[in-house]
Amino acid sequence: MASACAITTASQGVQREEPDPWLTDHSWAEPTDTVFPVSLGGHTVNARLYRLAVTGYEGRTNTLNLFDLDTIDESIVTEGIRFDKTDIEKCLTLFLYPDDSDEAGRLLRIYQQYLMVSAGAQLILAECQARGSNLHDLADYAAIQINDTHPSMVIPEPIRLLEEQGIAFDEAVQIVTDTCAYTNHTILAEALETWPWSYLEKVVPQLMPIIGKLDDLARTRTDDTRLAVVDEHGNVHMAHMDIHFTHSTNGVAALHTEILKNTELNGFYRLYP
């Protein structure tokens, strides 16, 4: 797995970044033989599952599941943390939250988000089925917590996977709604991601029919177009999708939740009190 951090230094007023190789071949993150296919822009990559043991309560052990690509190549990094952001198979997990000052960087963020969402959703469904779930009862076996909007595609992606298992769209939406909850951490724009439809269509064309249907469904619940999943400019509001299609929305503290209810997300609160 590749380094996800950088060391920042300054010399003569110039900031420089160097990779911090904190994650090495001797890491506690153990590779497994489990891989999940993930379609990125019509091209399939294989996300390998890594497991990291985490000390738990009363001597018990929890497991943190991580994913990476075998094709990642750190040698493409030059001049600190510069690399070709379009060479997805080599750079996808090199750096978390890469520079998004250009279109390539913004697309890379969506690629990163979908890799983790798709692989994670496939793992959740597989583990729940192994424990006896028939997927119709997924909410009895799993709880998916959406922290901010970075993993918001964990709503349409499980719907897609459930449809592949023969479950009708309307039921798949209800299953995902019952399984997912959303926590809003801040009202700042960077935590309320909005992606152009054209960007998502490049990265996850397989999700676009589902997102379109979710927007249609949300519009049947309210005449307030400000609450739509897709706005009049063709931008997809990830937080709106989260609120419409999860069973619970909260802030990180009681005061924050009250602010969301009374001001920032008041329209949604009136729709879903």
Residue locations for each model-derived region?
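A conserved ligand/cofactor-binding region detector
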Residues: 1-273
